[in-house]
Amino acid sequence: MARIAGVDIPRNKKIEIAITYIYGIGRSNGMDVLRKANVDPNRRVRDLTEEEVGRIREIIDREYRVEGDLRREVQLNIKRLMDIGCYRGLRHRRGMPVRGQRTRTNARTRRGRRGQAIGIKKKVKK
């Protein structure tokens, strides 16, 4: 396995897909990196030379914020929203949808599991 930005890249996948295993690199950013590094996107990771892997690693380190740094930045942005007390920060603090979705129904992912259903119990016969 090639190791780029602290992530083990799967050997059997094409490099254009495998590079997206890095947090912060999607399909379009991955293609940009490969274009700058002069690497064919259709080649498998196992077929890359050490020099090509080094070029990819260097471009990502130089031009992109990935993995731990990016996660930390996102967390700090959310914390800043909560500290200043804006609407988005309050929604984050309460664990509710932030981007205007409805909450009367269909907010289960953000709000967590539903409470116990309250219904009518059958009477036990004696």
Curated annotation (Swiss-Prot):
> What segment(s) does the record annotate as region Disordered?
95-126
Recorded GO cellular component terms are: cytosol; small ribosomal subunit
* GO term, biological process aspect, one: translation
Please give the name of this protein: Small ribosomal subunit protein uS13
Gene Ontology molecular function: any one:
tRNA binding
Record key words, sorted? Ribonucleoprotein, Ribosomal protein, RNA-binding, rRNA-binding, tRNA-binding
Would the keyword Ribonucleoprotein turn up in this protein's UniProt record?
A: yes
What is the disulfide pattern of this chain? none
Question: What is the native source organism of this protein?
Answer: Chloroflexus aggregans (strain MD-66 / DSM 9485)
Subunit relationships: Part of the 30S ribosomal subunit. Forms a loose heterodimer with protein S19. Forms two bridges to the 50S subunit in the 70S ribosome.
Family of this protein? Belongs to the universal ribosomal protein uS13 family.
What does the function comment of this entry state?
Answer: Located at the top of the head of the 30S subunit, it contacts several helices of the 16S rRNA. In the 70S ribosome it contacts the 23S rRNA (bridge B1a) and protein L5 of the 50S subunit (bridge B1b), connecting the 2 subunits; these bridges are implicated in subunit movement. Contacts the tRNAs in the A and P-sites.
Q: What Pfam families is this protein classified in?
A: Ribosomal_S13
Claim: Ribosomal protein is one of the keywords in the record: yes
